[in-house]
Amino acid sequence: MADEFGNGDALDLPVGKDAVNSLIRENSHIFSDTQCKVCSAVLISESQKLAHYQSRKHANKVRRYMAINQGEDSVPAKKFKAAPAEISDGEDRSKCCPVCNMTFSSPVVAESHYIGKTHIKNLRLREQGGVKEGMVNQAKKTRTPTVATKSDNKMDHSDRAKFCKLCHSTFNNPLMAEQHYAGKKHKKQETKTQIMTIYTSSGQTPAQAPIPLNLNSPMPGSGSAGKGFSCDKCNIVLNSIEQYQAHVSGAKHKNQLMSMTPLSEEGHQAVVAPSAIASGSAGKGFSCDTCNIVLNSIEQYQAHISGAKHKNHLKSMTPLSEEGHTAAVAPSAFASGSAGKGFSCDTCNIVLNSIEQYQAHISGAKHKNHLMSMTPLSEEGHTAAVAPSAFASGSAGKGFSCDTCNIVLNSIEQYQAHVSGAKHKNQLMSMTPSSEEGLPSAVGPSAFASPLSAGGALSSGGPSGRGFCPSGDLTPKGPSSFGSLPPLGSLLPPLYPPAHSSQPYVHDDTMSPDGYNYFNEDFE
């Protein structure tokens, strides 16, 4: 192998067996016939040895190795073409990067490296003191990793720049430590530790005793740190500190704590005995023996015992004594088998769900109508039109029947409106001829049912070819000229006048009650 490098772009390769053996003898500390320490290659044959030492890959690795260890006595200085002092900084940058321990085959590759992220990151670390200056110290540090690890282990719990006790994280340099302490993970762990310390040492709610310190809960530096937030009272694990805070301040956690001790608030003991709270359902809900239900939380339980349903169940166990209620419904209706299930009205044969519904029912029209249907009405005018038996008939409880009109009304109001209306009165009048003054006998129901004999031969559609009007007007008038009177045949003159008269036929019989004169225009 030649003793010198070229211009830095390539290394002169040994040619032939003698040149290879000479290279091995000159660099026996790194080369041998069976092993190349620079390439970490094991050579098992003569041909493999010659091929390896004459390869370009081996020459590049040797050049990189010498560039890194150029200050060591073990590497001969004659391997380089010129001394480092004779080489400018620009030429050094194009050959190798002492910061990243890299060599380059051309200035283009070197320039690409210097503008890359890796070089910029390593340069920043070196400027901040993370990477020691001097490649000799770097080489020693890389050659003795065991010693460095031992020294780091001694500083695990004392050097904050190399170890985080809270997160159990180690750092290679101060920059990594600063990034960690300013990061989200470390801040979250700090918040978690603070919250857990507060809730496990001095946290308490108004309705409970102080929570005892839980040794199994996540504490700073414990093994469970970073894996969740446990609540031993509710036997659950929360994923974040926000969820834990929401849980311990929520109703479920408070109910779980309160379910372990009977309630002592004023007013609750009178409604439900403490045994209902401390019963076998403790921790699973709050039972109300009166209503036979279980509530999920103390808030629901308090709302239940102060609500209408619970009060109605309590009232249903004792007959009502309010004025006016006992008269309509006997106390036995409340003490019957339906107690606790509703309020029954024997009058209407229905069951109400609450005392409010019952009170509204007995004061309503339906209940009053049923009461009135059991006794004949005594109001003036009603009994004359409808017999008392109409109220006490089989339709009682289902409506109010009118035998005159053969209909059934749903309420007493409808019945009263019916008997005072025109339809009912007309039905009564149609059963007996009217005798009121001024109404002709022909206007009765029979008058509309059949034409009179006087005009039986005429149709009711009015005269044909004859005119009739008030005061002798010759203009023919239709049936509407008579107002509300129907065009009856009895009001029309006969077809022909009597034979003994030559005067126009006007007879007293043709005078209508309204003063109409009926005549035949053929007889003038």
From Swiss-Prot:
Domain notes: The zinc-finger domains are required for binding to dsRNA, and also for nuclear localization.
Protein name according to UniProt: Zinc finger protein 346
Residues in Matrin-type zinc fingers: 34-64, 92-126, 162-192, 226-260, 286-316, 343-373, 400-430
Binding positions for Zn(2+) 1 per the UniProt entry: 36, 39, 52, 58
UniProt function note: Binds preferentially to dsRNA, but also to RNA-DNA hybrids.
Annotated keywords: Cytoplasm, Metal-binding, Nucleus, Repeat, RNA-binding, Zinc, Zinc-finger
Keyword Calcium in record: no
Entry annotated with the keyword Membrane: no
